[in-house]
């Protein structure tokens, strides 16, 4: 195993931060390949809790190289706020530990302004954006007017591109969206200061990662969000603006698919999602509220409460197929401890038949009725288990059904938020 991917197999918030931190112990390089600071990871080590948004989880180790690839959109202000936060809690962030792609797109102040104003203009049809400027930044990338990190390293180039973008964006912001114009000089001065601080971290990350893999070093690719938020395979338009599946790794860092050996899908023992969008197994009742409170289901980035529901294996099976998952890591089975009965969705009733795939059309999905299997629950002793054999029998039956239905082995089980509350039962 020289290069492997850690991906969310649901709508994000599956526990990727903890699992990446756990698996990073085996890696020498940890790489982010898509998304931006709209993602949030919580990692607990001992009695300390760390909240990460943009920087890879491997930063908590002193001996790991962390990489922000070209597929990531970088907000310099958010980046240095996160660096300051980490250094304030005793985590060193240096160019020896963190490098950033010169090809990564920069999130600019007008991206955040556009994000907020366009969401407001949608009214009741809003898509639940975090307002971080992620979507507008990716839009500029594909409209070929985006500003990259390498542009910021050349003052004249940056100034010219910024001037043209400010002219165009201000016209749209003021005349179409009714907002206030942004100041060219303020943004220029702010970003030139960022350039000085950013320069030591910048290099061609594709070459760096490629060389590390060729030297047989272990590289971990850390996904953000989840498969059902993928721009192509998610619940469009209630998705993020990047490819969150395994396919995003190759374009998001610049390596070939033959260099990736394994892909681990992270899934909770139940299902959650934030914001609007379809959710077939959602529990809008006391059980859903109970899961939310016991599982502390509130967003790291936004603080928004997460919608909670029964485990939807149709979603996880779809993730396994689309990303070619070689194993699953099932998290938060301790959260379900105490429920007498549990349900798992193994299909949808649709147009008089049962299907086991996720429809592309939201209109079709709205007609789908979950088909459930019921399981007996388990008690809180599950949180004390450190081997598979120590798990309650009912928890084992639940996990076995997950592996059977998705045709994907389970390699890791999470029984609590801390690094040590992790059971390894197989290779990934």
Swiss-Prot record:
The keyword Cytoplasm applies. Pfam families: Adenylsucc_synt. InterPro entries: Adenylosuccin_syn_GTP-bd, Adenylosuccin_syn_Lys_AS, Adenylosuccinate_synth_dom1, Adenylosuccinate_synth_dom2, Adenylosuccinate_synth_dom3, Adenylosuccinate_synthetase, P-loop_NTPase. It is an enzyme of class 6 (ligase). The active site is at residues 13, 41. GO terms for biological process: 'de novo' AMP biosynthetic process; IMP metabolic process. Disulfide bonds: none annotated. Mg(2+) binds at residues 13, 40. Binds 1 Mg(2+) ion per subunit. Homodimer. This is Adenylosuccinate synthetase. It comes from Clostridium botulinum (strain Eklund 17B / Type B). The lineage of its organism: Bacteria, Bacillati, Bacillota, Clostridia, Eubacteriales.
């Amino acid at each position: 195993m020289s290069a492997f991917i850690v991906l969310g197999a649901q709508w994000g918030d599956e526990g990727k931060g903890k699992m990446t931190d756990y698996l990073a112990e085996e890696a020498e390089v940890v790489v982010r390949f898509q998304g931006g600071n709209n993602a949030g990871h919580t990692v607990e080590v001992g009695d300390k809790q760390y909240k990460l948004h943009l920087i890879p989880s491997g930063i908590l180790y002193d001996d790991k190289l962390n990489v922000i690839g070209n597929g990531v959109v970088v907000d310099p202000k958010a980046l240095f706020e996160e660096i300051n936060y980490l250094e304030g809690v005793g985590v060193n962030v240096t160019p020896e530990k963190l490098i950033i792609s010169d090809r990564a797109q920069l999130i600019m102040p007008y991206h955040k302004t556009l994000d907020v104003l366009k969401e407001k203009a949608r009214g009741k049809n809003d898509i639940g954006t975090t307002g971080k400027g992620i979507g507008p930044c990716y839009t500029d990338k594909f409209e070929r007017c985006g500003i990259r990190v390498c542009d910021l390293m050349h003052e004249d180039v940056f100034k010219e591109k910024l001037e043209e973008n400010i002219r165009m964006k201000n016209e749209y912001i003021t005349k179409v969206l009714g907002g206030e114009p942004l100041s060219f000089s303020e943004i220029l001065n702010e970003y030139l200061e960022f350039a000085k601080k950013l320069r030591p971290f910048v290099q061609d990350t594709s070459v760096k990662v490629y060389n590390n893999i060729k030297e047989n070093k272990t590289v971990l690719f850390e996904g953000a969000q989840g498969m059902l938020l993928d721009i192509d395979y998610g619940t469009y338009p209630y998705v993020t603006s990047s490819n969150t599946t395994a396919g995003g790794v190759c374009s998001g860092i610049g390596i070939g698919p033959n260099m990736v050996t394994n892909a681990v899908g992270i899934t909770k023992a139940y299902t959650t999602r934030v914001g609007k969008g379809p959710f077939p197994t959602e529990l809008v009742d006391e059980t859903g509220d109970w899961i939310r409170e016991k599982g502390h289901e509130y967003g790291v980035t936004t603080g928004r409460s997460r919608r909670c529901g029964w485990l939807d294996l149709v979603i996880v099976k779809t993730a396994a197929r689309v990303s070619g998952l070689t194993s699953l890591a099932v998290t938060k089975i301790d959260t379900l401890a105490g429920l007498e009965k549990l349900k798992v969705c193994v299909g949808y009733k649709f147009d008089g038949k049962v299907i086991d795939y996720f429809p592309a059309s939201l209109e079709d999905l709205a007609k789908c009725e979950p088909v459930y299997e019921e399981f007996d629950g388990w008690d809180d002793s599950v949180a004390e288990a450190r081997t598979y054999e120590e798990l309650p029998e009912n928890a084992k039956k639940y996990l076995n059904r997950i592996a059977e239905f998705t045709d994907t082995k389970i390699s890791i089980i999470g029984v609590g938020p801390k690094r040590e509350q992790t059971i390894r039962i197989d290779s990934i």
